Design a protein with these regions (language model features):
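Non-cytosolic membrane-interface motifs at loop->transmembrane helix junctions
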Residues: 67-78, 135, 198-209
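A generic, lipid-embedded transmembrane alpha helix
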Residues: 45-63
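C-terminal transmembrane-bundle signature of multipass membrane proteins
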Residues: 84, 158-224
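Membrane-interfacial loop-to-transmembrane alpha-helix junctions, especially the N-terminal start
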Residues: 35-48, 101-108, 172-183, 224
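Internal transmembrane alpha-helix with an interfacial aromatic "cap," most often the third helix
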Residues: 23-33, 57-68, 78-113, 220
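Membrane-proximal helix-loop-helix units in multi-pass membrane proteins
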Residues: 82, 91-160
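Hydrophobic transmembrane alpha-helical segments in integral membrane proteins
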Residues: 1-25, 151-155
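Juxtamembrane "helix-exit" motif on the non-cytosolic side of transmembrane helices
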Residues: 30, 58-67, 119-128, 189-199
Length: 224
């Protein structure tokens, strides 16, 4: 089996499995919120909704016309731009910031959300080459350079912030779940671009995202 055939054989199945897992974590987060009334579980639910939408669009993309696919992917990018900064908010709750620090943390989160929204709204879409029965959109080369810069800054910056918090939590509490949430997201996000293979980058980011959400849920369930 060629490298390309291997991708084709696992890509669609991976998306479906991850989407089902997001739905499960969404349901479990509802249960935890009803028990504990913690805002962090609402944030987890919102994250899961974004990823579930992401999965549904990718799985059904091949059945859509190009115009409809581009329209649904604009919303994908908007959700991505808004939801990535919530990792900053998660970190404030993980470190148990007092009210003043938590307020500042939320202000930073909201500023980053606005920047992410502006970047997403300025993104020009193009239909990517199909693989693994997945038809998706990506960023067109005509997209302004600042959009890519903000996207990279949000993705890498928020994850590094998580990892720093994870190191602190490990030193203070001997707790490693929060660190692993950021670690897997960073590693899986870095391997793909380093390879220069867009399909590998896409597939690994899918794995990194689901591992991040799983470890976030485990952490907050344990320490809430």
């Amino acid at each position: 089996m060629s490298f390309r055939s291997f991708f084709d054989s696992i890509a669609l199945g991976s998306i479906i499995v991850c989407t089902v897992l997001y739905a499960l974590i969404f349901a479990l987060s509802i249960r935890e919120y009803l028990k504990m009334k913690r805002l962090v579980f609402i944030l987890l639910m919102i994250e899961c909704i974004g990823f579930i939408y992401d999965g549904i669009i990718m799985v059904s993309g091949k059945k859509m016309s190009d115009n409809i696919l581009k329209g649904t992917n604009i919303l994908r990018y908007i959700l991505h731009g808004i939801l990535v900064p919530t990792l900053i908010a998660f970190t404030g709750y993980a470190l148990q910031f007092r009210r003043d620090k938590l307020y500042i943390n939320w202000v930073v989160t909201l500023i980053c959300m606005i920047l992410g929204l502006l970047a997403a709204a300025s993104t020009k879409m193009q239909i990517e080459k199909e693989f693994g029965k997945i038809k998706r959109c990506g960023m067109h080369d005509d997209t302004p350079g600042w959009v890519s810069s903000i996207d990279t800054m949000m993705n890498i910056g928020s994850v590094i912030y998580m990892m720093i918090a994870g190191i602190i939590l490990f030193i203070v509490k001997r707790e490693f779940f929060y660190f692993l949430a950021g670690f897997f997201m960073l590693i899986f996000s870095a391997i793909g671009p380093a390879s220069g293979n867009k399909d590998l980058n896409f597939l690994l980011s899918v794995y990194g995202e689901i591992l991040m959400i799983i470890f976030l849920f485990v952490f907050f369930k344990k320490y809430s």
